[in-house]
Amino acid sequence: MFIFSHNPGSQGAKNLAEAIGIRRVRHEGSRINLGPRDTLINWGSSRLPAHVAGAGRILNRPESVASVGNKLRFFERFGNACRTVPWTADRTVVRRWLDEGGNVVVRNVLNGHSGEGIEIIEGRGVDIPVAPLYTKYVGKESEWRIHVLNGRVIDSTRKIRDPDFTGQPNWAVRNHDGGFIYARNSGTPSEDVVRQAVAAVEASGLDFGAVDVMVDRRDGAAYVLEINTAPGLVGTTVTRYAEAFGNIR
C-alpha cells in the first residue's frame, strides 16, 4: 500500500503514512512505478501521474475526487442522494429568497474550503453579486465532521469555539479564522447526521471522505455541506484512519 497526495507537503498524508507504515509517492523524480498488485490511497488528487495511475486498486478514484471538489457539480450530481442546503445558480431565485426575508450565502469559489470565497448577503434591496453558486442560509445548531470509509463511520468531531481564539468569533461562517475548531468529546452526532454523511460518500463513488454536516437549529435536519478527500489528520483521527486502512490490505 502507498499514498499519493495532491499536496506534496500535506501533513495529514504524512501523519497517515507514518501511522500505517507505508511510503508516500513523490510527484516527480520517484522511482516507484505502481502496478496491478499495488494499492494506492489517493489523498485528494483529481489527477494521478502515470507512475501511480497503474495501481491495481486506487482508494478514491481521481474522477470521484473531482466530482466532489467542485461544489456546484456536487450539488447537481448528488443533491438527490443526500440532503443539501437549498442552492441555485440563478440570481432570480436569490432575489426571491431575499424578498422572503432570508439570507443568502454567495459562493465565489467553487473549489474552496474552510469558508474561502464566502459572502453573506441579506435584505430586500441588496445588490446580488455575480457568482457561480448561491445557497440559502440555514441557521446552525451544530456542525460535524463525519469520517466515512467503505460505508462505515470511523470517526466524528464537532465544531466548537476555539478556547484559545481571542478575536470576534464569526458565527455565520464557522471556520478556523473565525474562531472555530473541530473537537472530539463534544457530543454524539444524530442518526440523521450519520445517515446523510454515509449517503453522500456512497453516492459520490468515493471509498472514503470527511463529510461536513450541519444541523438546522429550527428542526434538527442534517444538511451535507461538502466532502473533504484530503482532510487534516491529527491525534486520534490519524489512529482511526490507520486502523481502517490497515484492515483493507
Tell what function each PLM region has:
Residues 104, 152-155, 209, 223-225:
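Protein kinase-like catalytic core scaffold
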Residues 188, 202-208, 215-249:
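C-terminal active-site "lid" helix and adjoining low-complexity regulatory extension at the edge
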Residues 2-100:
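Conserved N-proximal alpha/beta basic substrate-recognition cap immediately N-terminal to
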Residues 148-150, 213-217:
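Short, low-complexity Ser/Thr-rich regulatory SLiMs
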Residues 105-192:
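Phosphate-binding site of ATP-dependent enzymes
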Residues 6, 41-44, 107-109, 135-137, ...:
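Short His-Asn-centered micro-motif
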Residues 192-202:
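A short, acidic, amphipathic alpha-helical segment used as a generic capping/interface helix at domain edges
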Residues 45-47, 109-111, 230:
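Short glycine-rich anion-binding loops that position phosphate/pyrophosphate groups of nucleotides
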